[in-house]
Amino acid sequence: MKKILFVLTLGLAMVLTSCGDQHKAQSLVKDFLNENLENEDCSFKRFSQLTPTAMIDFNRVKSMRQEMNQLPYMKKNIDYNDGTFPDTLMYLRATYQLTTHDGKKEELTQTFYLDKALTRIIAFKEN
């Protein structure tokens, strides 16, 4: 009986922790976009599950940053609060609706790469 209770408690703790990380990652992405969109009028539609990846290297991050610096609806020279490049990144896809300067609505899906501690956005790309 004690083993069953232990396993159930451990499972519940894991579920609550992963939900907390998902929420923290979503909040980080929302804050990043609110700070770096030229026009802050966006509404979020959905987020993917937070997932780890080791497939992105520093050169790919630099390339993504240069590409995203060209987007007309993003501020130029975004500050990514650079620190040590992590071995493993976490990624999250966000779909949101952006209202452009001329009032048109545009739906965008982007992938955001975060550090494992979920304290900063490392890079992002359009899908």
Sequence positions of predicted segments:
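Sec-dependent bacterial lipoprotein signal peptides
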Residues: 1-18
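Cystatin/cathelin-like cysteine-protease inhibitor module
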Residues: 19-127
